[in-house]
């Protein structure tokens, strides 16, 4: 195979890896935890991965404790639990 063909193949494999969503088995375990606002009383908008709907959804975080399924932005949630 020529060097141009190898570069094309490498480029296609890289593109495929970037566009392939994360499978349920590849997600961090905390992505399957329910939203947990914690015991504090702040009203901070955060996002969590809902494993039933398979989407990142908004919830109100109280500001302390909770769990790791708690993201400042929908993009961070999506990148971590849905895929790149």
Curated annotation (Swiss-Prot):
Cellular component GO terms, alphabetical: extracellular space
PROSITE patterns, sorted: BPTI_KUNITZ_1, BPTI_KUNITZ_2
Signal peptide residues on this chain, from the entry's feature table: 1-24
Keyword Transferase attributed: no
Compartments (UniProt record): Secreted
Domain BPTI/Kunitz inhibitor: 31-81
Main location class: secreted
CDD domains found in the cross-reference section: Kunitz_PPTI-like (cd22608)
A GO molecular-function annotation: serine-type endopeptidase inhibitor activity
InterPro entries assigned to the protein according to its UniProt record, in alphabetical order: Kunitz_BPTI, Kunitz_BPTI_sf, Prtase_inh_Kunz-CS, TFPI/VKTCI-like
Keywords from the UniProt entry: Disulfide bond, Protease inhibitor, Pyrrolidone carboxylic acid, Secreted, Serine protease inhibitor, Signal
UniProt site (Reactive bond for trypsin): 41-42
Record SUPFAM superfamilies: BPTI-like
Residues annotated with Pyrrolidone carboxylic acid modification: 25
Covalent S-S links between cysteines: 31-81, 40-64, 56-77
Function recorded in the entry: Serine protease inhibitor.
Protein name: Kunitz/BPTI-like toxin
Organism whose genome encodes this protein: Austrelaps superbus (Lowland copperhead snake)
Upper lineage: Eukaryota, Metazoa, Chordata, Craniata, Vertebrata
């Amino acid at each position: 195979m020529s060097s141009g063909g190898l570069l094309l193949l490498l480029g296609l494999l890289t593109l495929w890896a970037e566009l392939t969503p994360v499978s349920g088995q590849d997600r961090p375990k905390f992505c399957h935890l329910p939203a947990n606002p914690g015991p504090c009383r702040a009203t901070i908008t955060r996002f969590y991965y809902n494993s039933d709907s398979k989407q990142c959804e908004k919830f109100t975080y109280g500001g302390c404790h909770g769990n790791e399924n708690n993201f400042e932005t929908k993009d961070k949630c999506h990148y971590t639990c849905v895929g790149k």
